[in-house]
Amino acid sequence: MRPDLERNILLAKSIEKPWRGTYTLVGHTSAVVEAVTTLVDALGDRIISQFGLQCDFVKLRATARLAAYLHDWGKANDHFQMVVRHQSNPLQNPQLIRHEVASLLLGWQYREWLEDCPYSDFLTALAAAGGHHLKLGWNSRKQEPNDELGEIREGSGSDRLYLYMSPKYFEGMIKYGIKALDLPRQLPECVRKPPYCWQVAELKLRRSELLEAFLDWNHDPAFLGVIKALIVAGDAAGSAIPNTDLKIKDWIKKQAGTTLNEVELQQVVDERLAGQPIRPFQVALGNTSTRVSLARAGCGTGKTLGAYNWAKQYALGRKLFFCYPTTGTSTEGFIDYVHDQVDSVLLHSRSAVDLAHLAATGDEDDVETKLESFKAWGAKVSVCTVDTVLGLLQCNRRPMYCFPAIAQSAFVFDEVHCYDDRLFGGLLKFLEVVKAPVLLMSASFLPWQLEAIRKAVGEPVEVIEGAKELEILPRYKFYLSETPNWERVEQELSRTYELPNGDQSCGKVLWVCNQVGTAIAVYKEAKSRGLNALLYHSRYRYQDRVNHHRAVIKAFKKNEPVIAIATQVAEMSLDLSATLLVSQIADPAGLIQRLGRLNRRYIGRSLDAIFYPDPKVGFPYS
Protein backbone atom coordinates (compact mmCIF):
# COMPACT_ATOMS: atom_id res chain seq x y z
CA MET A 1 0.00 0.00 0.00
CA ARG A 2 1.26 3.46 -0.89
CA PRO A 3 2.24 5.48 2.20
CA ASP A 4 0.34 8.72 2.70
CA LEU A 5 2.43 11.89 2.79
CA GLU A 6 2.11 14.53 5.48
CA ARG A 7 -0.04 17.42 4.22
CA ASN A 8 -0.02 15.75 0.80
CA ILE A 9 3.24 17.57 0.00
CA LEU A 10 5.87 16.14 -2.32
CA LEU A 11 9.38 17.08 -1.25
CA ALA A 12 12.40 17.61 -3.50
CA LYS A 13 14.87 18.02 -0.61
CA SER A 14 15.06 17.15 3.06
CA ILE A 15 13.60 19.88 5.24
CA GLU A 16 15.84 22.08 7.35
CA LYS A 17 14.89 25.09 9.43
CA PRO A 18 13.81 27.65 8.47
CA TRP A 19 11.16 26.29 6.14
CA ARG A 20 11.52 27.31 2.50
CA GLY A 21 9.13 26.70 -0.33
CA THR A 22 11.96 25.32 -2.44
CA TYR A 23 11.99 22.18 -0.29
CA THR A 24 8.81 21.11 -2.10
CA LEU A 25 8.88 19.54 -5.55
CA VAL A 26 6.86 22.40 -7.04
CA GLY A 27 9.02 25.03 -5.34
CA HIS A 28 12.30 23.43 -6.36
CA THR A 29 11.09 22.89 -9.93
CA SER A 30 10.06 26.53 -10.14
CA ALA A 31 13.49 27.62 -8.87
CA VAL A 32 15.33 25.46 -11.42
CA VAL A 33 13.12 26.58 -14.31
CA GLU A 34 13.76 30.19 -13.29
CA ALA A 35 17.51 29.57 -13.02
CA VAL A 36 17.72 27.86 -16.41
CA THR A 37 15.54 30.50 -18.07
CA THR A 38 17.61 33.36 -16.65
CA LEU A 39 20.81 31.60 -17.62
CA VAL A 40 19.69 31.04 -21.22
CA ASP A 41 18.49 34.63 -21.51
CA ALA A 42 21.73 35.98 -20.03
CA LEU A 43 23.91 33.95 -22.41
CA GLY A 44 21.69 34.77 -25.37
CA ASP A 45 22.61 33.83 -28.92
CA ARG A 46 26.26 33.34 -27.94
CA ILE A 47 25.44 29.90 -26.60
CA ILE A 48 24.28 28.93 -30.10
CA SER A 49 27.41 30.23 -31.82
CA GLN A 50 29.73 28.88 -29.11
CA PHE A 51 28.62 25.30 -29.81
CA GLY A 52 27.60 25.61 -33.45
CA LEU A 53 23.98 24.67 -32.73
CA GLN A 54 21.59 24.29 -35.66
CA CYS A 55 18.50 25.38 -33.72
CA ASP A 56 17.24 28.91 -33.16
CA PHE A 57 17.18 30.66 -29.79
CA VAL A 58 13.43 30.15 -29.28
CA LYS A 59 13.77 26.38 -29.59
CA LEU A 60 16.82 26.31 -27.32
CA ARG A 61 15.04 28.31 -24.63
CA ALA A 62 11.80 26.31 -24.78
CA THR A 63 13.60 22.95 -24.72
CA ALA A 64 15.79 23.96 -21.77
CA ARG A 65 12.73 25.12 -19.82
CA LEU A 66 10.86 21.88 -20.54
CA ALA A 67 13.87 19.82 -19.44
CA ALA A 68 14.10 21.86 -16.24
CA TYR A 69 10.40 21.24 -15.60
CA LEU A 70 10.80 17.49 -16.10
CA HIS A 71 14.12 16.91 -14.37
CA ASP A 72 12.75 15.88 -10.94
CA TRP A 73 9.38 14.38 -11.79
CA GLY A 74 10.74 11.01 -10.72
CA LYS A 75 10.97 12.17 -7.11
CA ALA A 76 7.23 11.59 -6.87
CA ASN A 77 7.69 8.02 -5.62
CA ASP A 78 7.55 6.43 -2.19
CA HIS A 79 11.21 5.36 -2.07
CA PHE A 80 12.50 8.88 -2.62
CA GLN A 81 9.89 10.54 -0.42
CA MET A 82 10.71 8.23 2.49
CA VAL A 83 14.43 9.08 2.14
CA VAL A 84 13.97 12.87 2.24
CA ARG A 85 11.60 12.42 5.18
CA HIS A 86 14.32 10.41 7.00
CA GLN A 87 12.04 7.38 7.16
CA SER A 88 14.36 5.22 5.05
CA ASN A 89 18.14 4.85 4.94
CA PRO A 90 19.31 4.68 1.29
CA LEU A 91 22.61 3.11 2.36
CA GLN A 92 20.78 0.16 3.89
CA ASN A 93 17.82 0.09 1.50
CA PRO A 94 18.71 1.80 -1.79
CA GLN A 95 15.91 3.17 -3.92
CA LEU A 96 14.69 0.65 -6.47
CA ILE A 97 15.63 3.02 -9.32
CA ARG A 98 17.23 6.46 -9.35
CA HIS A 99 14.75 9.29 -9.54
CA GLU A 100 16.21 10.42 -12.90
CA VAL A 101 15.17 7.09 -14.43
CA ALA A 102 11.70 7.53 -12.98
CA SER A 103 11.61 11.03 -14.52
CA LEU A 104 12.39 9.55 -17.92
CA LEU A 105 9.73 6.86 -17.63
CA LEU A 106 7.07 9.26 -16.35
CA GLY A 107 7.91 11.86 -18.97
CA TRP A 108 7.56 9.24 -21.69
CA GLN A 109 4.22 8.08 -20.28
CA TYR A 110 2.99 11.72 -20.30
CA ARG A 111 4.42 12.48 -23.76
CA GLU A 112 1.01 13.09 -25.36
CA TRP A 113 0.68 16.16 -23.12
CA LEU A 114 4.34 17.23 -22.92
CA GLU A 115 4.92 17.12 -26.69
CA ASP A 116 2.55 20.08 -26.98
CA CYS A 117 4.95 22.37 -25.11
CA PRO A 118 5.31 25.22 -27.65
CA TYR A 119 8.52 25.42 -29.73
CA SER A 120 10.32 22.72 -27.70
CA ASP A 121 12.02 19.46 -28.67
CA PHE A 122 10.39 16.94 -26.34
CA LEU A 123 12.83 14.04 -26.80
CA THR A 124 15.87 16.26 -26.27
CA ALA A 125 14.29 17.73 -23.15
CA LEU A 126 13.42 14.27 -21.84
CA ALA A 127 16.91 12.87 -22.47
CA ALA A 128 18.55 15.89 -20.82
CA ALA A 129 16.22 15.71 -17.83
CA GLY A 130 16.94 12.02 -17.36
CA GLY A 131 20.70 12.51 -17.60
CA HIS A 132 21.04 15.60 -15.40
CA HIS A 133 22.72 13.67 -12.60
CA LEU A 134 26.14 12.21 -13.18
CA LYS A 135 25.54 8.74 -11.74
CA LEU A 136 22.99 7.72 -14.36
CA GLY A 137 24.28 4.82 -16.44
CA TRP A 138 26.47 3.54 -13.60
CA ASN A 139 26.19 0.17 -11.86
CA SER A 140 26.94 1.01 -8.23
CA ARG A 141 27.22 -2.64 -7.21
CA LYS A 142 29.76 -3.59 -9.89
CA GLN A 143 31.29 -0.08 -10.07
CA GLU A 144 31.18 -0.03 -13.85
CA PRO A 145 29.17 1.62 -16.64
CA ASN A 146 25.67 0.29 -17.23
CA ASP A 147 24.47 0.13 -20.82
CA GLU A 148 20.86 -0.13 -19.68
CA LEU A 149 18.69 2.85 -18.81
CA GLY A 150 19.69 2.94 -15.17
CA GLU A 151 19.99 -0.05 -12.90
CA ILE A 152 17.20 -1.72 -10.95
CA ARG A 153 18.85 -2.08 -7.60
CA GLU A 154 18.90 -5.02 -5.29
CA GLY A 155 18.35 -4.67 -1.55
CA SER A 156 15.69 -1.98 -1.69
CA GLY A 157 13.38 -4.11 0.44
CA SER A 158 10.57 -3.77 -2.09
CA ASP A 159 9.69 -5.12 -5.52
CA ARG A 160 7.60 -2.13 -6.49
CA LEU A 161 7.59 1.65 -6.69
CA TYR A 162 4.48 3.55 -5.58
CA LEU A 163 3.92 6.79 -7.50
CA TYR A 164 2.37 10.05 -6.31
CA MET A 165 0.98 11.25 -9.65
CA SER A 166 -2.67 11.61 -8.62
CA PRO A 167 -4.16 15.14 -8.31
CA LYS A 168 -3.97 14.82 -4.53
CA TYR A 169 -0.17 15.06 -4.76
CA PHE A 170 0.80 16.10 -8.30
CA GLU A 171 -1.83 18.69 -9.20
CA GLY A 172 0.53 21.53 -8.25
CA MET A 173 3.14 20.31 -10.74
CA ILE A 174 0.54 20.02 -13.52
CA LYS A 175 -0.80 23.52 -12.83
CA TYR A 176 2.74 24.92 -12.79
CA GLY A 177 3.45 23.34 -16.19
CA ILE A 178 0.29 24.90 -17.63
CA LYS A 179 1.12 28.33 -16.23
CA ALA A 180 4.89 28.48 -16.78
CA LEU A 181 5.34 26.45 -19.97
CA ASP A 182 1.97 27.05 -21.64
CA LEU A 183 1.19 23.33 -21.65
CA PRO A 184 -2.39 22.43 -22.71
CA ARG A 185 -5.13 22.99 -20.16
CA GLN A 186 -7.07 20.14 -21.74
CA LEU A 187 -5.46 17.11 -20.11
CA PRO A 188 -5.22 13.85 -22.08
CA GLU A 189 -6.09 10.52 -20.51
CA CYS A 190 -2.48 9.80 -19.52
CA VAL A 191 -2.67 12.78 -17.14
CA ARG A 192 -6.25 12.22 -16.00
CA LYS A 193 -5.53 8.56 -15.18
CA PRO A 194 -2.00 8.57 -13.78
CA PRO A 195 -0.01 5.44 -12.89
CA TYR A 196 -0.24 4.27 -9.28
CA CYS A 197 2.46 1.62 -8.95
CA TRP A 198 5.29 0.05 -10.97
CA GLN A 199 6.45 -3.45 -10.14
CA VAL A 200 9.89 -4.63 -11.28
CA ALA A 201 8.50 -6.45 -14.32
CA GLU A 202 6.64 -3.34 -15.47
CA LEU A 203 9.70 -1.17 -14.81
CA LYS A 204 11.78 -3.38 -17.08
CA LEU A 205 9.08 -3.32 -19.76
CA ARG A 206 8.72 0.47 -19.69
CA ARG A 207 12.48 0.87 -19.71
CA SER A 208 12.77 -1.36 -22.80
CA GLU A 209 10.00 0.55 -24.60
CA LEU A 210 11.75 3.85 -23.97
CA LEU A 211 15.12 2.52 -25.07
CA GLU A 212 13.57 1.22 -28.28
CA ALA A 213 12.05 4.64 -28.97
CA PHE A 214 15.41 6.32 -28.48
CA LEU A 215 17.16 3.87 -30.82
CA ASP A 216 15.44 5.48 -33.81
CA TRP A 217 16.00 9.02 -32.53
CA ASN A 218 18.05 11.16 -34.91
CA HIS A 219 19.30 13.85 -32.53
CA ASP A 220 21.90 16.62 -32.46
CA PRO A 221 24.50 15.57 -29.84
CA ALA A 222 25.71 19.16 -29.33
CA PHE A 223 22.16 20.41 -28.74
CA LEU A 224 21.48 17.61 -26.26
CA GLY A 225 24.79 18.25 -24.49
CA VAL A 226 24.07 21.96 -24.12
CA ILE A 227 20.58 21.35 -22.72
CA LYS A 228 21.94 18.78 -20.28
CA ALA A 229 24.71 21.12 -19.13
CA LEU A 230 22.18 23.92 -18.64
CA ILE A 231 20.06 21.62 -16.47
CA VAL A 232 23.03 20.52 -14.35
CA ALA A 233 24.11 24.13 -13.79
CA GLY A 234 20.56 25.37 -13.32
CA ASP A 235 19.74 22.56 -10.90
CA ALA A 236 22.84 23.43 -8.88
CA ALA A 237 21.85 27.09 -8.78
CA GLY A 238 18.21 26.29 -8.09
CA SER A 239 19.24 24.01 -5.23
CA ALA A 240 21.77 26.31 -3.61
CA ILE A 241 20.82 29.91 -4.20
CA PRO A 242 17.28 29.77 -2.74
CA ASN A 243 18.94 28.71 0.52
CA THR A 244 20.73 32.06 0.65
CA ASP A 245 19.55 35.66 0.59
CA LEU A 246 20.40 35.92 -3.11
CA LYS A 247 17.76 36.20 -5.82
CA ILE A 248 18.37 33.77 -8.66
CA LYS A 249 17.64 36.21 -11.48
CA ASP A 250 19.79 39.01 -10.09
CA TRP A 251 22.70 36.75 -9.20
CA ILE A 252 22.86 34.93 -12.54
CA LYS A 253 22.56 38.15 -14.55
CA LYS A 254 25.40 39.71 -12.59
CA GLN A 255 27.69 36.68 -12.90
CA ALA A 256 27.04 36.12 -16.60
CA GLY A 257 27.47 39.82 -17.35
CA THR A 258 30.96 39.95 -15.83
CA THR A 259 33.28 39.82 -18.84
CA LEU A 260 36.69 41.13 -19.86
CA ASN A 261 37.46 44.54 -21.30
CA GLU A 262 40.56 45.79 -23.08
CA VAL A 263 41.75 47.93 -20.18
CA GLU A 264 41.96 44.92 -17.86
CA LEU A 265 43.81 42.77 -20.36
CA GLN A 266 46.22 45.59 -21.16
CA GLN A 267 46.87 45.90 -17.43
CA VAL A 268 47.96 42.24 -17.28
CA VAL A 269 50.24 42.72 -20.30
CA ASP A 270 51.78 45.95 -18.98
CA GLU A 271 52.39 44.48 -15.54
CA ARG A 272 54.28 41.56 -17.03
CA LEU A 273 56.24 43.69 -19.52
CA ALA A 274 57.53 45.82 -16.64
CA GLY A 275 58.55 48.59 -19.01
CA GLN A 276 60.15 46.32 -21.63
CA PRO A 277 58.92 46.52 -25.26
CA ILE A 278 56.49 43.87 -26.43
CA ARG A 279 58.06 41.33 -28.80
CA PRO A 280 56.98 40.97 -32.45
CA PHE A 281 55.93 37.36 -31.74
CA GLN A 282 53.57 38.57 -29.01
CA VAL A 283 52.20 41.28 -31.29
CA ALA A 284 51.60 38.67 -34.00
CA LEU A 285 49.53 36.60 -31.58
CA GLY A 286 47.32 39.61 -30.99
CA ASN A 287 46.83 40.03 -34.74
CA THR A 288 45.88 36.47 -35.70
CA SER A 289 43.03 36.28 -38.19
CA THR A 290 41.68 32.78 -37.48
CA ARG A 291 39.34 31.68 -34.69
CA VAL A 292 41.73 28.89 -33.71
CA SER A 293 45.43 29.72 -33.70
CA LEU A 294 48.61 27.91 -32.68
CA ALA A 295 51.62 29.45 -30.98
CA ARG A 296 54.72 27.34 -31.55
CA ALA A 297 57.58 28.62 -29.42
CA GLY A 298 60.11 27.34 -26.93
CA CYS A 299 60.40 27.95 -23.20
CA GLY A 300 61.12 31.48 -22.10
CA THR A 301 60.00 33.16 -25.33
CA GLY A 302 56.97 34.93 -23.83
CA LYS A 303 54.07 32.72 -24.98
CA THR A 304 51.95 33.43 -21.92
CA LEU A 305 52.23 37.20 -22.24
CA GLY A 306 51.49 36.81 -25.94
CA ALA A 307 48.36 34.84 -25.04
CA TYR A 308 47.01 37.74 -23.00
CA ASN A 309 47.76 40.00 -25.96
CA TRP A 310 45.78 37.51 -28.11
CA ALA A 311 42.95 37.78 -25.60
CA LYS A 312 42.74 41.54 -26.26
CA GLN A 313 41.24 40.62 -29.63
CA TYR A 314 39.42 37.37 -28.91
CA ALA A 315 38.28 37.55 -25.27
CA LEU A 316 36.74 41.03 -25.21
CA GLY A 317 33.18 40.78 -23.93
CA ARG A 318 33.91 37.18 -22.95
CA LYS A 319 35.46 35.30 -20.10
CA LEU A 320 38.86 33.62 -20.49
CA PHE A 321 39.92 30.11 -19.51
CA PHE A 322 43.68 29.55 -19.29
CA CYS A 323 44.29 25.79 -19.22
CA TYR A 324 47.48 24.05 -18.04
CA PRO A 325 48.29 20.32 -17.92
CA THR A 326 49.11 20.23 -14.18
CA THR A 327 47.91 21.77 -10.94
CA GLY A 328 51.36 23.25 -10.36
CA THR A 329 51.50 25.10 -13.68
CA SER A 330 47.93 26.36 -13.33
CA THR A 331 48.62 27.65 -9.82
CA GLU A 332 51.76 29.50 -10.91
CA GLY A 333 50.02 30.86 -14.00
CA PHE A 334 47.31 32.23 -11.73
CA ILE A 335 49.66 33.81 -9.20
CA ASP A 336 52.14 35.22 -11.70
CA TYR A 337 49.63 36.82 -14.06
CA VAL A 338 46.09 37.56 -12.87
CA HIS A 339 45.90 37.17 -9.10
CA ASP A 340 44.84 40.56 -7.64
CA GLN A 341 44.79 42.14 -11.13
CA VAL A 342 41.59 40.85 -12.75
CA ASP A 343 38.49 39.22 -11.29
CA SER A 344 39.85 35.69 -11.50
CA VAL A 345 39.63 32.24 -9.99
CA LEU A 346 41.89 29.20 -9.79
CA LEU A 347 40.06 26.01 -10.73
CA HIS A 348 41.43 22.52 -10.33
CA SER A 349 40.87 19.54 -8.09
CA ARG A 350 43.33 20.85 -5.49
CA SER A 351 42.78 24.58 -5.76
CA ALA A 352 41.30 24.57 -2.25
CA VAL A 353 44.76 23.81 -0.94
CA ASP A 354 46.40 26.35 -3.22
CA LEU A 355 44.17 29.31 -2.35
CA ALA A 356 42.67 28.16 0.95
CA HIS A 357 39.30 29.52 -0.11
CA LEU A 358 37.35 26.60 -1.53
CA ALA A 359 35.42 24.05 0.48
CA ALA A 360 36.38 20.38 0.24
CA THR A 361 34.52 18.46 -2.43
CA GLY A 362 31.57 16.68 -0.91
CA ASP A 363 28.46 14.95 -2.13
CA GLU A 364 27.04 16.15 -5.42
CA ASP A 365 24.06 17.57 -3.57
CA ASP A 366 26.16 19.50 -1.06
CA VAL A 367 25.04 23.12 -1.22
CA GLU A 368 28.36 24.61 -0.15
CA THR A 369 30.29 22.69 -2.80
CA LYS A 370 27.95 23.95 -5.50
CA LEU A 371 28.15 27.52 -4.27
CA GLU A 372 31.94 27.34 -4.36
CA SER A 373 31.82 25.98 -7.91
CA PHE A 374 29.88 29.08 -8.91
CA LYS A 375 32.97 31.27 -8.47
CA ALA A 376 33.82 30.59 -12.10
CA TRP A 377 30.44 31.99 -13.18
CA GLY A 378 31.47 35.51 -12.20
CA ALA A 379 35.23 35.29 -12.75
CA LYS A 380 36.59 37.09 -15.79
CA VAL A 381 39.65 34.82 -15.96
CA SER A 382 39.68 31.19 -14.83
CA VAL A 383 43.10 29.53 -14.58
CA CYS A 384 42.68 25.78 -14.44
CA THR A 385 43.92 22.33 -15.28
CA VAL A 386 42.93 21.24 -18.75
CA ASP A 387 40.51 18.58 -17.46
CA THR A 388 38.36 21.37 -15.99
CA VAL A 389 37.40 22.32 -19.55
CA LEU A 390 37.84 19.13 -21.56
CA GLY A 391 35.86 17.18 -18.95
CA LEU A 392 32.73 18.98 -20.14
CA LEU A 393 32.45 16.53 -23.02
CA GLN A 394 32.66 13.60 -20.57
CA CYS A 395 30.03 15.21 -18.30
CA ASN A 396 32.48 15.58 -15.41
CA ARG A 397 31.09 17.40 -12.40
CA ARG A 398 33.25 20.54 -12.19
CA PRO A 399 33.02 21.58 -15.87
CA MET A 400 29.28 20.91 -15.89
CA TYR A 401 28.87 23.23 -12.91
CA CYS A 402 31.14 25.75 -14.68
CA PHE A 403 29.17 25.54 -17.93
CA PRO A 404 27.74 29.09 -17.76
CA ALA A 405 31.31 30.41 -17.80
CA ILE A 406 32.57 27.93 -20.41
CA ALA A 407 29.63 28.81 -22.66
CA GLN A 408 30.88 32.38 -23.12
CA SER A 409 34.65 32.03 -22.90
CA ALA A 410 37.71 32.12 -25.07
CA PHE A 411 40.30 29.43 -24.31
CA VAL A 412 44.07 29.17 -24.10
CA PHE A 413 45.60 25.69 -23.84
CA ASP A 414 49.25 25.84 -22.78
CA GLU A 415 51.99 23.18 -22.96
CA VAL A 416 50.06 21.03 -25.41
CA HIS A 417 53.27 19.05 -26.06
CA CYS A 418 52.82 17.57 -22.56
CA TYR A 419 49.41 16.05 -23.32
CA ASP A 420 49.17 12.28 -23.34
CA ASP A 421 47.01 10.47 -25.91
CA ARG A 422 43.89 10.73 -23.75
CA LEU A 423 44.20 14.47 -23.20
CA PHE A 424 45.10 15.19 -26.81
CA GLY A 425 42.11 13.14 -27.96
CA GLY A 426 39.91 15.14 -25.60
CA LEU A 427 41.34 18.37 -27.01
CA LEU A 428 40.53 17.28 -30.56
CA LYS A 429 36.94 16.50 -29.56
CA PHE A 430 36.67 19.89 -27.87
CA LEU A 431 37.93 21.64 -31.01
CA GLU A 432 35.40 19.71 -33.08
CA VAL A 433 32.42 20.61 -30.89
CA VAL A 434 33.18 24.03 -29.39
CA LYS A 435 33.31 26.97 -31.81
CA ALA A 436 34.87 29.47 -29.42
CA PRO A 437 38.13 31.40 -29.96
CA VAL A 438 41.00 29.05 -29.03
CA LEU A 439 44.76 29.52 -28.77
CA LEU A 440 46.93 26.40 -28.54
CA MET A 441 50.48 26.90 -27.27
CA SER A 442 53.32 24.41 -27.38
CA ALA A 443 57.07 24.16 -27.70
CA SER A 444 56.42 21.92 -30.70
CA PHE A 445 53.63 20.38 -32.75
CA LEU A 446 54.28 17.16 -34.65
CA PRO A 447 53.04 17.05 -38.26
CA TRP A 448 50.34 14.49 -37.42
CA GLN A 449 49.17 16.67 -34.52
CA LEU A 450 48.85 19.70 -36.78
CA GLU A 451 46.88 17.65 -39.29
CA ALA A 452 44.59 16.28 -36.56
CA ILE A 453 43.99 19.77 -35.14
CA ARG A 454 43.14 21.22 -38.56
CA LYS A 455 40.77 18.32 -39.27
CA ALA A 456 39.01 18.74 -35.91
CA VAL A 457 38.63 22.51 -36.32
CA GLY A 458 37.35 22.21 -39.89
CA GLU A 459 38.41 25.74 -40.86
CA PRO A 460 41.71 27.61 -41.39
CA VAL A 461 44.18 27.51 -38.50
CA GLU A 462 47.04 30.01 -38.28
CA VAL A 463 50.40 28.97 -36.82
CA ILE A 464 52.43 31.74 -35.18
CA GLU A 465 56.09 30.89 -34.79
CA GLY A 466 58.09 32.04 -31.79
CA ALA A 467 60.82 34.63 -32.00
CA LYS A 468 63.56 32.84 -33.93
CA GLU A 469 66.18 35.26 -32.62
CA LEU A 470 65.37 34.03 -29.11
CA GLU A 471 65.05 30.36 -29.96
CA ILE A 472 68.42 30.19 -31.77
CA LEU A 473 70.31 31.86 -28.95
CA PRO A 474 73.01 29.53 -27.56
CA ARG A 475 71.49 28.75 -24.16
CA TYR A 476 73.21 25.52 -23.09
CA LYS A 477 76.56 23.80 -22.89
CA PHE A 478 76.31 20.07 -22.20
CA TYR A 479 78.68 18.11 -19.96
CA LEU A 480 78.59 14.45 -18.99
CA SER A 481 80.07 13.51 -15.64
CA GLU A 482 80.41 10.13 -13.93
CA THR A 483 79.64 11.67 -10.53
CA PRO A 484 78.15 14.94 -9.27
CA ASN A 485 80.62 17.83 -9.17
CA TRP A 486 80.03 19.67 -5.90
CA GLU A 487 82.98 21.97 -6.51
CA ARG A 488 81.28 23.23 -9.68
CA VAL A 489 78.03 23.77 -7.78
CA GLU A 490 79.72 25.83 -5.06
CA GLN A 491 81.57 27.79 -7.72
CA GLU A 492 78.26 28.61 -9.43
CA LEU A 493 76.68 29.88 -6.24
CA SER A 494 79.55 32.32 -5.76
CA ARG A 495 79.18 33.81 -9.24
CA THR A 496 77.57 37.06 -10.28
CA TYR A 497 76.25 37.49 -13.83
CA GLU A 498 75.97 40.71 -15.81
CA LEU A 499 72.57 40.72 -17.52
CA PRO A 500 71.94 42.20 -20.98
CA ASN A 501 70.02 45.10 -19.41
CA GLY A 502 72.91 45.99 -17.11
CA ASP A 503 71.52 44.38 -13.95
CA GLN A 504 73.36 41.71 -12.00
CA SER A 505 72.17 38.26 -10.95
CA CYS A 506 73.54 35.73 -8.48
CA GLY A 507 74.17 32.13 -9.49
CA LYS A 508 71.22 29.78 -9.03
CA VAL A 509 71.38 25.99 -9.32
CA LEU A 510 68.61 23.53 -10.17
CA TRP A 511 69.53 19.92 -9.37
CA VAL A 512 67.03 17.33 -10.62
CA CYS A 513 67.09 13.72 -9.41
CA ASN A 514 65.07 10.77 -10.65
CA GLN A 515 64.16 9.37 -7.22
CA VAL A 516 62.97 11.02 -4.03
CA GLY A 517 65.60 9.17 -1.99
CA THR A 518 68.38 10.52 -4.19
CA ALA A 519 66.98 14.04 -3.92
CA ILE A 520 66.89 13.84 -0.13
CA ALA A 521 70.49 12.61 -0.03
CA VAL A 522 71.64 15.47 -2.29
CA TYR A 523 69.72 17.96 -0.15
CA LYS A 524 71.38 16.71 3.03
CA GLU A 525 74.80 16.99 1.39
CA ALA A 526 74.04 20.55 0.27
CA LYS A 527 72.96 21.55 3.78
CA SER A 528 76.08 19.96 5.27
CA ARG A 529 78.12 22.20 2.98
CA GLY A 530 76.32 25.26 4.30
CA LEU A 531 74.49 26.01 1.05
CA ASN A 532 71.16 27.82 0.79
CA ALA A 533 69.28 24.69 -0.29
CA LEU A 534 65.59 23.91 -0.86
CA LEU A 535 64.02 20.48 -1.39
CA TYR A 536 60.98 19.87 -3.59
CA HIS A 537 59.71 16.42 -4.55
CA SER A 538 56.50 14.59 -5.43
CA ARG A 539 55.99 12.65 -2.21
CA TYR A 540 55.13 15.57 0.00
CA ARG A 541 51.50 15.81 0.99
CA TYR A 542 49.89 18.07 -1.58
CA GLN A 543 49.44 20.94 0.85
CA ASP A 544 53.12 20.77 1.82
CA ARG A 545 54.10 20.40 -1.81
CA VAL A 546 52.36 23.65 -2.68
CA ASN A 547 54.31 25.42 0.06
CA HIS A 548 57.63 23.96 -1.12
CA HIS A 549 56.77 24.84 -4.71
CA ARG A 550 56.19 28.47 -3.84
CA ALA A 551 59.26 28.62 -1.64
CA VAL A 552 61.42 27.56 -4.60
CA ILE A 553 59.78 30.06 -6.96
CA LYS A 554 60.19 32.86 -4.40
CA ALA A 555 63.84 31.99 -3.73
CA PHE A 556 64.72 32.08 -7.44
CA LYS A 557 63.11 35.50 -7.81
CA LYS A 558 65.41 36.96 -5.16
CA ASN A 559 68.87 38.14 -6.13
CA GLU A 560 70.53 35.66 -3.80
CA PRO A 561 72.41 32.39 -4.47
CA VAL A 562 70.22 29.31 -4.02
CA ILE A 563 70.18 25.63 -4.96
CA ALA A 564 66.89 23.78 -5.43
CA ILE A 565 66.97 19.99 -5.35
CA ALA A 566 63.91 18.48 -7.02
CA THR A 567 62.53 15.35 -8.65
CA GLN A 568 60.52 15.16 -11.88
CA VAL A 569 58.07 17.75 -10.49
CA ALA A 570 60.58 20.27 -11.88
CA GLU A 571 59.90 19.13 -15.42
CA MET A 572 56.73 21.10 -15.89
CA SER A 573 55.51 23.26 -13.07
CA LEU A 574 58.58 25.27 -12.06
CA ASP A 575 58.63 28.67 -13.74
CA LEU A 576 62.19 29.64 -12.81
CA SER A 577 65.49 30.39 -14.49
CA ALA A 578 68.61 28.61 -13.24
CA THR A 579 72.19 29.47 -14.17
CA LEU A 580 73.38 25.87 -13.71
CA LEU A 581 71.47 22.63 -14.26
CA VAL A 582 72.65 19.40 -12.66
CA SER A 583 70.54 16.41 -13.66
CA GLN A 584 70.56 12.66 -13.60
CA ILE A 585 70.13 11.16 -17.05
CA ALA A 586 66.45 10.51 -17.77
CA ASP A 587 64.20 9.98 -20.79
CA PRO A 588 64.60 12.55 -23.59
CA ALA A 589 61.24 14.24 -22.97
CA GLY A 590 62.09 14.71 -19.30
CA LEU A 591 65.54 16.09 -20.08
CA ILE A 592 64.07 18.60 -22.54
CA GLN A 593 61.65 19.81 -19.87
CA ARG A 594 64.47 20.13 -17.32
CA LEU A 595 66.57 22.13 -19.78
CA GLY A 596 63.63 24.50 -20.12
CA ARG A 597 64.45 25.73 -16.60
CA LEU A 598 68.07 26.60 -17.47
CA ASN A 599 68.77 30.10 -18.81
CA ARG A 600 65.02 30.59 -19.19
CA ARG A 601 65.50 34.34 -18.72
CA TYR A 602 68.41 34.63 -21.13
CA ILE A 603 71.60 35.66 -19.35
CA GLY A 604 73.41 36.80 -22.49
CA ARG A 605 75.38 33.61 -23.19
CA SER A 606 75.14 29.83 -22.93
CA LEU A 607 75.15 28.19 -19.49
CA ASP A 608 76.22 24.76 -18.27
CA ALA A 609 74.04 21.66 -18.02
CA ILE A 610 75.79 18.77 -16.26
CA PHE A 611 74.34 15.28 -16.62
CA TYR A 612 75.37 12.22 -14.62
CA PRO A 613 74.17 8.59 -14.70
CA ASP A 614 71.32 7.13 -12.70
CA PRO A 615 72.31 3.73 -11.26
CA LYS A 616 68.65 2.65 -11.46
CA VAL A 617 68.72 2.55 -15.24
CA GLY A 618 65.32 1.57 -16.62
CA PHE A 619 63.46 2.76 -13.53
CA PRO A 620 64.07 6.51 -13.52
CA TYR A 621 61.06 7.48 -11.39
CA SER A 622 60.64 4.51 -9.06
Protein language model features and the residues they cover:
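Accessory nucleic-acid engagement/destabilization modules that flank
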Residues: 2-257
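Conserved segment of the helicase C-terminal RecA-like domain
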Residues: 109, 597-622
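Walker A/P-loop
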Residues: 288-311
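Conserved Walker A/P-loop ATP-binding site and its immediately adjacent core
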Residues: 313, 317-351, 445-450, 516
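Conserved strand-helix element at the start of the C-terminal RecA-like helicase core
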Residues: 319-330, 500-527, 534-535
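Inter-Walker segment of RecA-like/P-loop motor cores
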Residues: 342-395
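Post-DEXD/H (motif II) to motif III coupling segment of the RecA-like Helicase ATP-binding lobe
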Residues: 400-413, 417-468
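Interdomain hinge/linker at the junction between the two RecA-like core domains of SF2 helicases
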Residues: 445-502
